[in-house]
Amino acid sequence: MEDGTQVSTLERVIKEVQAPALSTPTDEMFWSPEDPSKPNLQFLKQHFYREGRLTEEQALWIIHAGTQILRSEPNLLEMDAPITVCGDVHGQYYDLMKLFEVGGDPSETRYLFLGDYVDRGYFSIECVLYLWALKIWYPNSLWLLRGNHECRHLTDYFTFKLECKHKYSERIYEACIESFCALPLAAVMNKQFLCIHGGLSPELHTLEDIKSIDRFREPPTHGLMCDILWADPLEEFGQEKTGDYFVHNSVRGCSYFFSYPAACAFLEKNNLLSIIRAHEAQDAGYRMYRKTRTTGFPSVMTIFSAPNYLDVYNNKAAVLKYENNVMNIRQFNCTPHPYWLPNFMDVFTWSLPFVGEKITDMLIAILNTCSKEELEDETPTSVSPSAPSPPLPMDVESSEFKRRAIKNKILAIGRLSRVFQVLREESERVTELKTAAGGRLPAGTLMLGAEGIKQAITNFEDARKVDLQNERLPPSHEEVIKRSEEERRAALERAQQEADNDTGLATVARRISMSAGSGRSRRQRDAARETREA
């Protein structure tokens, strides 16, 4: 190393970091010794912690077995206290393990998850497989609700589909989508609390309305099922300037904002105490909204269980524990996790544009060896302002033809350099956290690592504002592809135009082509003289 330290290539440099699990488990390892009909939870926990993967058959078994249990459950679950309620997980498997440390072992603690197990984080499939395995073991003490990200539209737009294809196959992804459609939509806890992922709807009057939904499908972009998954409380909840119960949700691009009067009216009509929901990142991991006038209890509570969301929010996570009519909030911080490049790229694919850009820059620098005096001596001859004559066919052996060919090659190198620059900027783009200005972090941020990102986004509110566009209902798959192709085409055209307008590059090309041309002319004159002398 630079400091003279000798490092063995046969050992891990940082020995305290556990090596990834490179092999898939045998059936003996996968099945539990206590109950051979169920997966080994302790093994799965450690195997996933080491970034291990299952065989496709083992993963499919967990998903299908979990789906059968979920499909047998009603739209609206009912459970008694004690229970621990958890919010969004978003593929943060290592923080999910911390959640179980804080909340209690699932074998001894009853859990209700409010959805959003996948997307944004890079360990979504591990979260699904482990939670579904827990559901297989504890079907009557661990419950899973559906979030807005448990659908084909969002998982295709964000990271989950790509993750499934990278770590397993599209077959696993399709099995997950089928399973997501079986997830229940809501729960009534202790006959007092309505637990849902999103919020209320103009079409939700009584709990019977939830029971009548056909949930076994892709969520629509409007209607009761959409609102349960997508709605939010108004930002000025409890201090509304309008008397409307529901306002179009401009942040999400679908569904509604619901007001304090709407929440109070629903709770009173259904004889409930509060609405417990997830769906929104919170700096402290939770938020208590204005209390109702009749009970003095918060009308709405938001729980968010993904700490340091996207590795930049710097937020705490929380779980809500309800026992003996006492409600406790337990917060926890993030846990270190393995790093993935954006979109699961490997380091060689990610670095190629950087290497290409530097090589072409070096080539141009090598070619650019002319002095200022040479440039002044080799300025192009002015052309008469008379009417231009039509271009004449050029002899491929002529000096002018070869001069132009060399010039075009130099310009092509310049264009290639600009293209590599565009590709390098594409590699630097953080697709999961786009800034409002141009959809990118400042150039070079990723090269600075975690510290660079921390400097670019300094606090929770900055991160939330930057990430708002990713909280919206995404465009269709076809529209995304079309937009991406248009952006790439425009970027490459801009790169070519910049290269064509680069006066320094044009000067280099002219100088080298003229030098080459004059060299050929000199050789031709020498050859002719030798012929005459002979």
Curated annotation (Swiss-Prot):
It catalyses: O-phospho-L-seryl-[protein] + H2O = L-seryl-[protein] + phosphate; O-phospho-L-threonyl-[protein] + H2O = L-threonyl-[protein] + phosphate. Coiled coil: none annotated. Residues 375-398, 475-534 are annotated as: Disordered. Residues 475-497, 524-534 have a biased composition (Basic and acidic residues). Fe cation binds at residues 88, 90, 116. Its EC number is 3.1.3.16. GO terms for biological process: calcineurin-mediated signaling; fungal-type cell wall organization. GO terms for cellular component: calcineurin complex; cytoplasm. The keyword Metal-binding applies. Gene3D superfamilies: 3.60.21.10. One of its GO terms (molecular function) is calmodulin binding. Zn(2+) binds at residues 116, 148, 197, 279. Binds 1 Fe(3+) ion per subunit. Its cofactor is Fe(3+); Zn(2+). It is an enzyme of class 3 (hydrolase). Pfam families: Metallophos. The keyword Nucleotide-binding does not apply. Keywords: Calmodulin-binding, Hydrolase, Iron, Metal-binding, Protein phosphatase, Zinc. The active site is at 149 (proton donor). Belongs to the PPP phosphatase family. PP-2B subfamily. Composed of two components (A and B), the A component is the catalytic subunit and the B component confers calcium sensitivity. Calcium-dependent, calmodulin-stimulated protein phosphatase. This subunit may have a role in the calmodulin activation of calcineurin. This is Serine/threonine-protein phosphatase 2B catalytic subunit. It comes from Aspergillus fumigatus (strain ATCC MYA-4609 / CBS 101355 / FGSC A1100 / Af293) (Neosartorya fumigata).
